[in-house]
Design a protein with these regions (language model features):
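N-terminal cap/lid segment of alpha/beta-hydrolase-fold proteins
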Residues: 3-68
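Short beta-strand element of the alpha/beta-hydrolase
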Residues: 69-79
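Alpha/beta-hydrolase active-site loop signature
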Residues: 80, 108-110
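Conserved HGGG/HGGXW glycine-rich cap/lid loop of the alpha/beta-hydrolase fold
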Residues: 83
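Short amphipathic alpha-helix adjacent to the substrate-entry channel of hydrolases
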Residues: 87-106
């Protein structure tokens, strides 16, 4: 069995540096996410910053499908415990919503 010794855990989770032009993606997601959030809020199908714990970032956004949900998808965003938050990823809930699932997008303490 091969074991890898990790000496710098911050570096181990900094996967963005391993993606060519990876730094451009967070900015590219801002507008689609904001538009998606505004659209669902206008339809009364979104609730923002609901609490699931006592820490300041223990919040989630809940997006509801049209009609009764078939279930719940819980999305824990990437960011590798280093940066970003739930608001960058909201538009990724569209597929689950289109198939009738509610989506909870979690933020967490970095």
């Amino acid at each position: 069995m091969l074991y890898h010794r990790i000496e710098d855990w911050d570096d181990a989770y900094a996967n963005g540096v391993n993606i060519p032009r990876g730094e451009r993606w967070p900015d590219a997601w801002v507008e689609p996410s904001q538009s998606f959030r505004a659209s669902l809020e206008a339809q009364d199908r979104a609730r923002f910053d609901l609490s699931y714990g006592s820490a300041p970032r223990n919040r989630f956004d809940l997006f509801m499908p049209e009609g009764a949900p078939r279930g719940l998808v819980v999305f824990v965003h990437g960011g590798f415990w280093l940066r970003l938050d739930k608001s960058f990823w909201s538009h990724l809930a569209a597929g689950s919503l289109a198939h009738g699932y509610a989506v909870a997008m979690l933020a967490y303490t970095l």
